[in-house]
Amino acid sequence: MTTGNTVYMSAKASLLRTPAKTVLLAGAMLSALGLATSVWASGDSGYCAPDWRLSAPSYDCAGRAMLSPGNDTRINMLLLMRSLRPASEDNDRDTYDTALGRTFFSWDSMSASLQRRPERKVELALGNCQIGAEGILAFRDALAAEKGLSAADRSGLDRLRAQVGCRAVEWGGFTAASAPGREFLAYLKAADAFYGGDWAGARAGFSALTGARSRWVAETARYMPIRIGLRAAVAEAVDQYGDFAGPDKANDEAVTSAHEAIDDYLKAYPNGRYATSAKGLIRRVAWLENDQATFAHLLENELATRPGNTAAAAALANEIDGKLLEQDGADAFIANLGNTPLLLTISNLKRMRSSSNEAMTLSADELAVQKNQFSAYGDLYGFLLATRSFQAQEQPATILRLLPDAARESRYTPLAFSRQVLRGMTLSRASDPNEAGFWRELLGGSSPTFQRPLVELGLATRWQRGPKLSDIFAPGSPVTDTSTRELLLQTRATPAILRAAARDPSRPLRERDIALFSLLFKQLNHGAYADFTKDLALVPTDADNRTGLWSFADQATIPVGLFSKGTWGDEFVCPSLDRTAAALARNPRDRKAQLCLGDFYRLNGFDGFRLFRPGPTADYLGYGPDGVPGRALYREDLYNEVIADRSAPADLRAYALYRAVMCYAPSGYSDCLGAARNDPENDAAAAPQSRRKAWFTELKQRYPDSQWAKDLRYYW
């Protein structure tokens, strides 16, 4: 199809989504039917580690409560809908995730929070059900409202309805005693034909019921031909993999039938119980007819009028994303329509993404040409201009003129909030002395669920750069979000801050344990052994030492007890860690104590472990010098020091050589260099194979009678 000079997407265009998204194309078939389904395009494919900063210049698996180029496009759509149809109060459900905190969220968690649990439970028959609880409950309500039904009829019909659409129905010779009961039974048999793919039988069955005495049966029978047409249209439109092959493969006759059925139903029941659904299915028909202009305009209208805090809004976002925005040529198509500013907003934000490998594709000239389309949305257009300028790193003064200060409002729509956060980000980039004051004022009207933590992130990022770091953890601090505080405790916090945080009974246990764990680990790792021996007394007697460190970022329990009751040694005998640390405090070159510290790391899961590592620039939370001074020493560093000491006792040098070689077993990559290093740093720090061979040879030749020479058979 062409619109003007723009060649629009082919019907079989690739459904490849934005990075970190995946698609199950089979969902598109069910979606085309108007059935409850989800096209799985998860913003956080697997584990999501967000970029802890306000800006998201490229796609980020973690969404923010502001319109942003880096957001999943569906998150931006919901935020836009909520801006146009704001709720009377903040009704976001808390979707706290330890890794994302309350500052970020995924599309999955956002959409799931909109799914309302039914007040009544429904037991579905076993099988591959094509129906949901809503259909069962609607049928049950219709039975209850039908006065002419006997109790036996109601019970039997309800039993049969639970089977229809799930498996072969056990009719069992059931016959309804009343006329309404016979109408409901005929309805169930027509529905069974529908779910079984007998389109002709279903049409005949429902057609015979459009004049039923039961108003529910009559209206539903007139509505169901829409569903029959849509399902028949795609029933055979599958490719070699069993996926939906695209609208151009749909059955045109069935699509036309569905279109006619919509007109017929809305003429008979313009305000009927299914009127909203029927009007929504006009979009499906337009899509299957490849009438993309009509489809896009219908989507635009839905964006403008649908409340953004419902499950239907999430379904609409999925539909727009999968059937329009992610199709080839969609951006140019939307721009050339000339009158779909809301769709254009979402497309523009996506086109503003940039990275080191890919430049932003939306130019200032293109955005200027679009101005007339936004005549009814001045604030939105101003935000787009400011966002593009910010992404292009243009002069802060230009951006600030587009975003007047409104930080003292009592409440913000997502768009209004986005404008103010972008203003704060621009103040930060300009090193404006009033930045912190701006963030503090913006806190007042921010919604507590996701907006306030984002503002706190802005304030904390500002305060971490100067003498105000301690204010973040002071009593009465406006920075209350535990995730933000925990990350700063692992990075910028000084020993004094860590000690105070570990003792603060007003804070959550996990935050206190993060503070104490960070303090003790860094003291060992940075060589502050005397301080470690003193602060070890802060570890509670019942502290956990069994949880491990594999999921430190999001595990509920922090194993602070590892430092007081961990494993001290195996074949190489070592004293408790407090005694090892005391020995190192007296003499940092105590070779036995150094080896025992290495064994503590090895035996308690510290190989590959790291505290939070901030991003590389000042706009990342945690960026800056480590709050605990000193160079970090990892296991291999300790072994190298012992090996370099030719005067060290033979048994200690032999063990150091053995452990240094074993660091590279069996992969050839060292486990002993600290996970905080990236691959190039690891490669630079790793011992070349020639050195590993030299360690192996020295152990075998200089200490042939040692246990460690006898145990070691290879080098890697």
Where are these regions (language model features)?
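Bacterial N-terminal signal peptides
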Residues: 23-34
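N-terminal secretory signal peptides that target proteins for export/translocation
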Residues: 1-20
